Amino acid sequence: MNFLSVRPSDSDLISSDLYELLESISTKRKMEKHTYLFREGMDAEELYLIQSGLIEIGKLTSDGKDLTLRICQKHDIVGELTLFTEEPRYMLSAKVLEDGEVLVINKNKLEKELIQNGALTFEFMKWMSTHLRKIQSKIRDLLLHGKKGALYSTLIRLSNSYGVERSDGILINIVLTNQDLAKFCAAARESVNRMLGDLRKKGVISIDESGKIILHKRDYLRCEIECENCPLEICNID
């Protein structure tokens, strides 16, 4: 996957004071493609601030399918949902998609620092709440509208995060295989193939010569999933 992001990173959504605190109490660690920073169910002792590379955040569904919830890159933070919880365990898995480096932040050390600064604690908890809303909205689309709803909402989120306006619609400026899209929907690749084929026949999307999707009728997708018009900070692919 080749991600050419235009969305804000987590460092754009938190203050410089909080970001500097995270950097000051961290240590560097290399990460290799196809390894995991953590897996769902493991004891949660660390948070990670990405310096380079790509990380996929997801989980296994009850029927054994991969469900991708986030794709994280430079300056994003992962593992944050375990803060201020007793006997914390990671709720999701973090798979390395591209070699890189992370800053490792000890959970207990961060909690001690935040307790001494109420303003930064409030900011961090507010930021965590935003991430929870993102995950909840993605799961909502899957539960209420099935695989089709998950695919349609994924295309909308991709257009918000990586979209480039054109005269004929919105170019989603990343290259994704149908298998990549299937993981965002916890669906089989064959199902995604059929759904994308239907959208092409209806003129909702097309594929350019480089394999990128052009979204011609985003309002059609919004109508189909009864879009709630969430703000862009919620309706994106991270």
Swiss-Prot record:
<keyword id="KW-0479">Metal-binding</keyword>
<keyword id="KW-0010">Activator</keyword>
<feature type="domain" description="HTH crp-type">
    <location>
        <begin position="145"/>
        <end position="219"/>
    </location>
</feature>
<feature type="DNA-binding region" description="H-T-H motif">
    <location>
        <begin position="178"/>
        <end position="197"/>
    </location>
</feature>
<keyword id="KW-0963">Cytoplasm</keyword>
<dbReference type="GO" id="GO:0005829">
    <property type="term" value="C:cytosol"/>
</dbReference>
<feature type="binding site">
    <location>
        <position position="227"/>
    </location>
    <ligand>
        <name>[4Fe-4S] cluster</name>
    </ligand>
</feature>
<keyword id="KW-0238">DNA-binding</keyword>
<dbReference type="InterPro" id="IPR036390">
    <property type="entry name" value="WH_DNA-bd_sf"/>
</dbReference>
<dbReference type="GO" id="GO:0046872">
    <property type="term" value="F:metal ion binding"/>
</dbReference>
<dbReference type="InterPro" id="IPR036388">
    <property type="entry name" value="WH-like_DNA-bd_sf"/>
</dbReference>
<dbReference type="GO" id="GO:0003677">
    <property type="term" value="F:DNA binding"/>
</dbReference>
<keyword id="KW-0805">Transcription regulation</keyword>
<dbReference type="Pfam" id="PF00325">
    <property type="entry name" value="Crp"/>
</dbReference>
<dbReference type="InterPro" id="IPR018335">
    <property type="entry name" value="Tscrpt_reg_HTH_Crp-type_CS"/>
</dbReference>
<protein>
    <recommendedName>
        <fullName>Anaerobic regulatory protein</fullName>
    </recommendedName>
</protein>
<feature type="binding site">
    <location>
        <position position="223"/>
    </location>
    <ligand>
        <name>[4Fe-4S] cluster</name>
    </ligand>
</feature>
<dbReference type="InterPro" id="IPR014710">
    <property type="entry name" value="RmlC-like_jellyroll"/>
</dbReference>
<comment type="function">
    <text>It is involved in the activation of genes necessary for anaerobic respiration.</text>
</comment>
<keyword id="KW-0408">Iron</keyword>
<keyword id="KW-0804">Transcription</keyword>
<dbReference type="InterPro" id="IPR000595">
    <property type="entry name" value="cNMP-bd_dom"/>
</dbReference>
<keyword id="KW-0411">Iron-sulfur</keyword>
<dbReference type="GO" id="GO:0003700">
    <property type="term" value="F:DNA-binding transcription factor activity"/>
</dbReference>
<feature type="binding site">
    <location>
        <position position="235"/>
    </location>
    <ligand>
        <name>[4Fe-4S] cluster</name>
    </ligand>
</feature>
<dbReference type="Pfam" id="PF00027">
    <property type="entry name" value="cNMP_binding"/>
</dbReference>
<feature type="binding site">
    <location>
        <position position="230"/>
    </location>
    <ligand>
        <name>[4Fe-4S] cluster</name>
    </ligand>
</feature>
<dbReference type="InterPro" id="IPR012318">
    <property type="entry name" value="HTH_CRP"/>
</dbReference>
<keyword id="KW-0004">4Fe-4S</keyword>
<dbReference type="InterPro" id="IPR050397">
    <property type="entry name" value="Env_Response_Regulators"/>
</dbReference>
<dbReference type="GO" id="GO:0051539">
    <property type="term" value="F:4 iron, 4 sulfur cluster binding"/>
</dbReference>
<dbReference type="InterPro" id="IPR018490">
    <property type="entry name" value="cNMP-bd_dom_sf"/>
</dbReference>
<comment type="subunit">
    <text>Homodimer.</text>
</comment>
<feature type="region of interest" description="Essential for the oxygen-regulated activity">
    <location>
        <begin position="223"/>
        <end position="235"/>
    </location>
</feature>
